[in-house]
């Protein structure tokens, strides 16, 4: 029995879940918006906001942690350059989740997650 479940399991083993969230985080930072299921969007929000907070911090250690998580190294450098001017006065809430219509095949609740 899992009390106080802090991360959604997304019906995947831990390694697949981590790879999925890393890929979605990389895509969201690159594209600015991603269409996915509502549960994945909510899990993705935590990881993306953590990466943007690291970018706002701007230290070498924070940059190395972000490089270890985000798949594209050039994307990390551009994130660290733009994060302070884009999110400098904002304390969290860097993403927005907008619900959309259900997916046709399996009626899953879909959502668009985008950077504010």
UniProtKB/Swiss-Prot annotation:
A Pfam family that the UniProt record links to this protein? Ribosomal_L17
Against SUPFAM superfamilies, the record matches this protein to: Prokaryotic ribosomal protein L17
Q: Does the keyword Ribonucleoprotein apply?
A: yes
The UniProt keywords, alphabetically, are: Ribonucleoprotein, Ribosomal protein
Q: Which InterPro entries match?
A: Ribosomal_bL17 (IPR000456), Ribosomal_bL17_sf (IPR036373)
Report the record's Gene Ontology biological process terms.
Answer: translation
GO CC, sorted alphabetically, is: cytosolic large ribosomal subunit
Q: Name one GO molecular function term.
A: structural constituent of ribosome
Answer whether the UniProt record assigns the keyword Ribonucleoprotein to this protein: yes
Q: Which family does it belong to?
A: Belongs to the bacterial ribosomal protein bL17 family.
How does it associate, per the subunit comment?
Part of the 50S ribosomal subunit. Contacts protein L32.
Matching NCBIfam families: L17 (TIGR00059)
Q: What is this protein called?
A: Large ribosomal subunit protein bL17
Q: Which organism is it from?
A: Prochlorococcus marinus (strain MIT 9515)
């Amino acid at each position: 029995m899992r009390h106080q479940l802090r991360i959604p399991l997304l019906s995947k083993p831990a390694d697949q879940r981590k790879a999925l969230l890393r890929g979605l985080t990389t895509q969201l930072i690159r594209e600015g918006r991603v269409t996915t299921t509502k549960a994945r969007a909510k899990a993705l929000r935590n990881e993306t906001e953590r990466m943007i907070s690291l970018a706002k911090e701007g230290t070498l250690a924070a940059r190395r942690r972000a490089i270890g998580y985000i798949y594209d190294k050039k994307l990390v450098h551009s994130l660290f350059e733009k994060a302070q001017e884009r999110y400098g006065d904002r304390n969290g809430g860097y993403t927005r989740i907008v619900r959309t219509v259900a997916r046709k095949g399996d009626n899953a609740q879909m959502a668009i997650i985008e950077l504010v």
